[in-house]
Amino acid sequence: MRKFSILLALLLVFSLAGCGGKDSAKADIFDLVEENSDTILEACTQLDAEALEQLEGITRVHVTDGYILVYCTGSGIAPSSQDHGFYYAPDGQPVAVFDGQILCGTDELNPEGDGFVYLDSGQNRFYTEHIMGNLYYYSASF
Protein backbone atom coordinates (compact mmCIF):
# COMPACT_ATOMS: atom_id res chain seq x y z
CA MET A 1 0.00 0.00 0.00
CA ARG A 2 2.84 2.39 0.85
CA LYS A 3 4.53 1.82 -2.54
CA PHE A 4 1.22 2.48 -4.29
CA SER A 5 0.77 5.76 -2.37
CA ILE A 6 4.29 6.90 -3.25
CA LEU A 7 3.78 5.96 -6.89
CA LEU A 8 0.46 7.80 -6.98
CA ALA A 9 2.02 10.91 -5.39
CA LEU A 10 4.89 10.90 -7.92
CA LEU A 11 2.46 10.49 -10.80
CA LEU A 12 0.42 13.44 -9.54
CA VAL A 13 3.51 15.65 -9.15
CA PHE A 14 4.78 14.87 -12.66
CA SER A 15 1.39 15.35 -14.26
CA LEU A 16 0.91 18.71 -12.54
CA ALA A 17 4.42 19.82 -13.54
CA GLY A 18 3.53 19.24 -17.18
CA CYS A 19 0.35 21.28 -16.90
CA GLY A 20 2.13 24.58 -16.28
CA GLY A 21 4.44 24.44 -19.29
CA LYS A 22 2.32 26.46 -21.69
CA ASP A 23 1.61 29.31 -19.28
CA SER A 24 5.23 29.36 -18.12
CA ALA A 25 6.52 29.58 -21.72
CA LYS A 26 4.05 32.35 -22.47
CA ALA A 27 5.04 34.33 -19.37
CA ASP A 28 8.74 33.85 -20.17
CA ILE A 29 8.25 35.14 -23.73
CA PHE A 30 6.23 38.16 -22.58
CA ASP A 31 9.03 38.92 -20.08
CA LEU A 32 11.73 38.46 -22.74
CA VAL A 33 9.99 40.88 -25.11
CA GLU A 34 9.17 43.46 -22.44
CA GLU A 35 12.69 43.41 -20.92
CA ASN A 36 14.38 43.71 -24.34
CA SER A 37 11.75 45.75 -26.15
CA ASP A 38 14.09 48.48 -27.47
CA THR A 39 16.58 45.97 -28.92
CA ILE A 40 13.82 43.74 -30.31
CA LEU A 41 11.86 46.58 -31.92
CA GLU A 42 14.98 48.07 -33.51
CA ALA A 43 16.08 44.67 -34.87
CA CYS A 44 12.58 43.91 -36.18
CA THR A 45 12.12 47.21 -37.97
CA GLN A 46 15.56 46.71 -39.59
CA LEU A 47 14.78 43.02 -40.36
CA ASP A 48 17.98 42.13 -38.46
CA ALA A 49 17.68 38.44 -37.56
CA GLU A 50 21.29 38.27 -36.32
CA ALA A 51 20.68 40.91 -33.63
CA LEU A 52 17.68 38.94 -32.35
CA GLU A 53 19.60 35.64 -32.31
CA GLN A 54 22.06 37.22 -29.86
CA LEU A 55 19.36 37.50 -27.17
CA GLU A 56 19.17 34.75 -24.59
CA GLY A 57 15.92 32.81 -24.93
CA ILE A 58 15.74 33.07 -28.73
CA THR A 59 16.51 29.85 -30.58
CA ARG A 60 15.73 30.59 -34.24
CA VAL A 61 14.64 33.58 -36.34
CA HIS A 62 12.96 33.65 -39.77
CA VAL A 63 12.38 36.75 -41.90
CA THR A 64 9.55 36.44 -44.41
CA ASP A 65 7.58 39.14 -46.25
CA GLY A 66 8.55 41.82 -43.71
CA TYR A 67 7.56 39.62 -40.75
CA ILE A 68 10.09 38.50 -38.16
CA LEU A 69 9.14 35.07 -36.78
CA VAL A 70 11.01 34.14 -33.60
CA TYR A 71 11.04 30.61 -32.18
CA CYS A 72 11.87 30.48 -28.47
CA THR A 73 10.97 27.04 -27.10
CA GLY A 74 9.03 23.88 -27.75
CA SER A 75 8.14 20.58 -26.16
CA GLY A 76 6.68 17.19 -26.94
CA ILE A 77 6.70 14.87 -29.90
CA ALA A 78 4.12 15.07 -32.69
CA PRO A 79 1.15 14.64 -32.50
CA SER A 80 1.32 16.35 -29.12
CA SER A 81 4.01 18.98 -29.66
CA GLN A 82 3.91 22.66 -28.87
CA ASP A 83 6.09 25.54 -30.11
CA HIS A 84 6.24 29.00 -28.53
CA GLY A 85 7.67 32.28 -29.70
CA PHE A 86 6.80 35.75 -30.87
CA TYR A 87 6.62 37.63 -34.12
CA TYR A 88 6.77 41.15 -35.47
CA ALA A 89 3.87 42.08 -37.76
CA PRO A 90 4.81 45.09 -39.93
CA ASP A 91 1.16 46.11 -40.31
CA GLY A 92 0.41 45.51 -36.61
CA GLN A 93 -2.21 42.85 -37.36
CA PRO A 94 -2.16 39.34 -35.85
CA VAL A 95 -1.56 36.27 -38.03
CA ALA A 96 -1.10 32.54 -37.42
CA VAL A 97 2.52 31.41 -37.67
CA PHE A 98 4.28 28.06 -37.55
CA ASP A 99 7.76 26.82 -38.40
CA GLY A 100 8.89 30.08 -39.95
CA GLN A 101 5.77 30.49 -42.09
CA ILE A 102 2.63 32.59 -42.00
CA LEU A 103 -0.35 30.23 -42.14
CA CYS A 104 -3.19 32.72 -42.37
CA GLY A 105 -4.06 36.38 -42.03
CA THR A 106 -6.22 38.21 -39.54
CA ASP A 107 -9.45 37.43 -41.41
CA GLU A 108 -9.12 33.68 -40.64
CA LEU A 109 -8.46 34.11 -36.91
CA ASN A 110 -11.17 33.64 -34.30
CA PRO A 111 -11.20 35.51 -30.97
CA GLU A 112 -10.28 33.39 -27.95
CA GLY A 113 -9.38 34.61 -24.47
CA ASP A 114 -6.97 37.53 -24.77
CA GLY A 115 -5.99 36.64 -28.33
CA PHE A 116 -6.94 34.75 -31.45
CA VAL A 117 -6.90 31.14 -32.57
CA TYR A 118 -6.68 29.41 -35.94
CA LEU A 119 -7.51 25.73 -36.44
CA ASP A 120 -6.28 24.19 -39.66
CA SER A 121 -7.94 21.32 -41.51
CA GLY A 122 -6.16 18.80 -39.28
CA GLN A 123 -6.05 18.94 -35.51
CA ASN A 124 -3.41 21.65 -35.39
CA ARG A 125 -4.08 24.73 -33.27
CA PHE A 126 -2.37 28.09 -33.55
CA TYR A 127 -2.85 30.81 -30.92
CA THR A 128 -1.61 34.42 -30.99
CA GLU A 129 -1.83 37.25 -28.47
CA HIS A 130 -0.71 40.88 -28.55
CA ILE A 131 2.34 41.69 -26.41
CA MET A 132 3.09 45.33 -27.32
CA GLY A 133 3.30 47.50 -30.42
CA ASN A 134 3.63 45.24 -33.45
CA LEU A 135 4.83 42.26 -31.39
CA TYR A 136 2.70 39.16 -30.80
CA TYR A 137 3.14 35.95 -28.83
CA TYR A 138 2.34 32.67 -30.59
CA SER A 139 1.92 29.03 -29.68
CA ALA A 140 1.45 26.21 -32.15
CA SER A 141 0.06 22.84 -31.06
CA PHE A 142 0.39 20.02 -33.56
Where are these regions (language model features)?
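Residue-level detector of functional hotspots within protein domains
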Residues: R2-S5, K26, S121
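Extended hydrophobic/Leu-rich segments
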Residues: L8, L52-L55, F116
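Sec-dependent N-terminal signal peptides of Gram-positive bacterial secreted proteins and lipoproteins
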Residues: K3-G21
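Extracytoplasmic electrostatic interaction patches
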Residues: T64-F142
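N-terminal export/targeting and maturation segments
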Residues: C19-A78
